[in-house]
Amino acid sequence: MSEKKINLLDLDRKGLRALFTEMGEKPFRADQLMKWIYHFGVSDFEEMTNINKVLRSKLAERCVIVAPEIASFQKSADGTIKFAINVGQGQEVETVYIPEDDRATLCVSSQVGCALECTFCSTGQQGFNRNLTVSEIVGQIWRVAQFLGFVKTTGERPITNVVMMGMGEPLLNLKNVIPAMDIMLDDFGFSLSKRRVTLSTSGVVPALDILGDSIDVALAVSIHAPNDELRDILVPVNKKYPLAEFLGGIRRYIAKSNANRGRVTVEYVMLDHINDSTEQAHELAKLMKDTPCKVNLIPFNPYPGSPYGRSSNSRIDRFSKVLMEYGFTVIVRKTRGDDIDAACGQLAGDIRDRTKRLAKKRMQENQISVTMD
């Protein structure tokens, strides 16, 4: 039985240099190879003209360059494109391309499904299947860049920003997420600034500490509630790592990071009469007063069977004004791609429609109190 070939997309530069050394080659060949793969989108060794023919043959015998395929895509009226990426065994993850002015952001998945079961998130209701490999994470970027068009003569790439905000909790897949982000940041990889790579987490605190010791990228934190009582319902991982513990981890990360310029982005989904009262805005401001941050208010994007509604513009505006009175920078996120279910919280692969009856049942089970202001 022939030995399984190494997928070079699974190796960061350190891993590639080790491979070349083991093959009896100079480590700098790894740099050349990465440039072909990530700058020019080349997957055929024969096209790598500055690598000698003997080495190209050795690579072809032992290695492959294989990214997961695009199974389908949908394009929104606003230019957003949602890709279904086939990761094998009948499984798909979703990747979203968001163009805006002079930037083009790719929202990348880290897991098939998600184990955290956030009650406002469609992916969280799908359940967890498995972690994605390094090649399946960076392969999303590589494949979408190929779809959009690498400019092979210049090495220009069509993606300027990557956010680890797709399906899954990145901190539950650190083994593969860290080398994948290394490739994103590497000058011979996707060559993105550390301020242009953002990881979003719901608060797996021990893994956040490991992340801070391993790599420096921008951090977004999913808060979504101003107190533990409500967050236990909306973000169940809070029962294990409550807000005080999460905020401590965030401050430790900020202290180590240059990418965040001294503050993180707080993500707060706006759920109608659930977490959007002016009293809760005051509570959130007091909660975050010792954690340098800007606040990103995210209008809720409904999905079939969701027990929640989107906050009205007037409630979002009042909430925002309270936070600004405390000196916070507040951004209300534009909803992009909601006509193709590509907006925040809507990514769920094969998740099926839930009925209104199920939504009502979930609301009753969680005993969520509704604010009346």
UniProtKB/Swiss-Prot annotation:
S-adenosyl-L-methionine binds at G168, E169, S200, S222, I223, H224, N301. Its main location: cytoplasm. Binds 1 [4Fe-4S] cluster. The cluster is coordinated with 3 cysteines and an exchangeable S-adenosyl-L-methionine. [4Fe-4S] cluster binds at C114, C118, C121. InterPro entries: Aldolase_TIM, Methyltransferase_A, RlmN_N, RNA_MTrfase_RlmN, rRNA_lsu_MTrfase_RlmN/Cfr, rSAM. Its EC number is 2.1.1.192. The active site is at E94, C344. It catalyses: adenosine(2503) in 23S rRNA + 2 reduced [2Fe-2S]-[ferredoxin] + 2 S-adenosyl-L-methionine = 2-methyladenosine(2503) in 23S rRNA + 5'-deoxyadenosine + L-methionine + 2 oxidized [2Fe-2S]-[ferredoxin] + S-adenosyl-L-homocysteine; adenosine(37) in tRNA + 2 reduced [2Fe-2S]-[ferredoxin] + 2 S-adenosyl-L-methionine = 2-methyladenosine(37) in tRNA + 5'-deoxyadenosine + L-methionine + 2 oxidized [2Fe-2S]-[ferredoxin] + S-adenosyl-L-homocysteine. Keywords: 4Fe-4S, Cytoplasm, Disulfide bond, Iron, Iron-sulfur, Metal-binding, Methyltransferase, rRNA processing, S-adenosyl-L-methionine, Transferase, tRNA processing. Its cofactor is [4Fe-4S] cluster. The keyword Methyltransferase applies. Residues 100-339 form the Radical SAM core domain. One of its GO terms (molecular function) is tRNA (adenine(37)-C2)-methyltransferase activity. It is found in: Cytoplasm. GO terms for cellular component: cytoplasm. Specifically methylates position 2 of adenine 2503 in 23S rRNA and position 2 of adenine 37 in tRNAs. m2A2503 modification seems to play a crucial role in the proofreading step occurring at the peptidyl transferase center and thus would serve to optimize ribosomal fidelity. This is Dual-specificity RNA methyltransferase RlmN. The gene is rlmN.
